[in-house]
Amino acid sequence: MLTFNLNAISSSFSVVPFHANYPLSTQTQLLVPSNLSYSFATTGTRKFKSFQLKAGFWESIKSGLMKNNSMQVIDPPSADEEDEEPLPQEFVLVEKTEPDGTIEQIIFSSGGDVDVYDLQALCDKGWPRRPLSKLAAALKNSYIVASLHSIRKSPGSEGNEQKRLIGMARATSDHAFNATIWDVLVDPGYQGQGLGKALIEKLIRTLLQRDIGNITLFADSQVVEFYRNLGFEADPEGIKGMFWYPNH
């Protein structure tokens, strides 16, 4: 179990997505934040948690995404640090122009509008298939569902956009103190571009803005060190993640 360490937030903060998905293997660890204090009610604490993330968010995205001059990272509306407003539920994260004039936008959304059939199609590209009814229930019962959609616009094809789900992550929560991140998926064709980092960082930022400070996730053993380097800690203060499995 890995926990996100609030004290480790810096201007260079970024998070590498984990690749553990149901069913959990015996080599999976639950990762959680080391700051386990529940005193998150004061305005000063909220500002500390959200504003420390602000500086490094777009810089980390740009460093991973801007590989040529035809790609543009579009910043969301800025806000004064003393009175930061929550980011919009949907905005253009990346826009790039291909040699043939086709424009592709990567849209980030935290509104939870993910089609279950689109999600199943994404899972079929490298993750275990799950029953549609359970996928729908998981989405419905999540606290936050964050997604990435690719929208492609070809020259002369106004009104005929191609929209495709290319990434998703979700969080469950008690709506007060704790949240766990699940099902981090990025289309293999879009991996290695920093989109997974952007997706998870935005999800964490949204949780912190909602005054939820204990953020955990599951990670395969081979990526635990990546999370330690990014502010997550395994077994903070000796606290263990425990699992119950049926005996049959």
From Swiss-Prot:
It is found in: Cytoplasm; Nucleus. GO terms for molecular function: N-acetyltransferase activity. The keyword Cytoplasm applies. Keywords: Acyltransferase, Cytoplasm, Nucleus, Transferase. Its EC number is 2.3.1.-. It holds the Pfam family Acetyltransf_1. The keyword Nucleotide-binding does not apply. Residues 106-248 form the N-acetyltransferase domain. GO terms for cellular component: cytoplasm; nucleus. PANTHER family: ACYL-COA N-ACYLTRANSFERASE, GCN5-RELATED N-ACETYLTRANSFERASE 2, CHLOROPLASTIC. Belongs to the acetyltransferase family. Does not interact with the effector Avh52 from the pathogen Phytophtora sojae. May acetylate histones H2A and H3. This is Probable acetyltransferase TAP2.
